[in-house]
């Protein structure tokens, strides 16, 4: 049985994105546009379940509006993987702690957060 035929046997991996700036926009674009390629590499479908933003009124190109939310906590609790690309120390730290404590895997490149609170988080 090929890897792709096995994909339908498993539920999608739910991905939450925290932040919709330059990096977040590109991550979302890749998750949405490269769905098949990513599924073949990962062995499961990656489903972008939402993008947490601070302000829904800010104009954002490339995001389906139904994915945007200001309720980061609910989004985090619905995800298997949380990708934090908001930057800064807060609320990023609290969101990562919530994700880790709820059993989600976390991806971040937030150097300031890792330098300041890395030992507490991981």
Give residue ranges: language-model regions.
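Rossmann-fold NAD(P)-binding glycine/threonine-rich loop
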Residues: 92-102, 111-122
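N-terminal glycine-/serine-/threonine-rich beta1-alpha1-beta2 phosphate-ribose binding loop
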Residues: 2-104
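Short hydrophobic alpha-helical runs that function as membrane-insertion/retention elements
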Residues: 106-108
């Amino acid at each position: 049985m090929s890897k792709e035929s096995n994909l339908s046997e498993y539920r999608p991996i739910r991905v939450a994105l925290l932040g919709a700036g330059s990096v977040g926009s590109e991550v979302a674009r890749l998750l949405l546009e490269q769905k098949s390629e990513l599924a073949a590499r990962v062995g499961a479908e990656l489903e972008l379940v939402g993008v947490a933003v601070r302000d829904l009124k800010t104009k954002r190109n490339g995001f389906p509006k139904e994915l945007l939310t200001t309720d980061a906590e609910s989004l985090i609790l619905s995800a298997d993987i949380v990708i934090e690309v908001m930057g800064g120390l807060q609320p990023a730290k609290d969101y990562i702690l919530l994700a880790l404590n709820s059993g989600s895997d976390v991806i971040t490149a937030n150097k300031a957060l890792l330098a300041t609170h890395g030992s507490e988080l991981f």
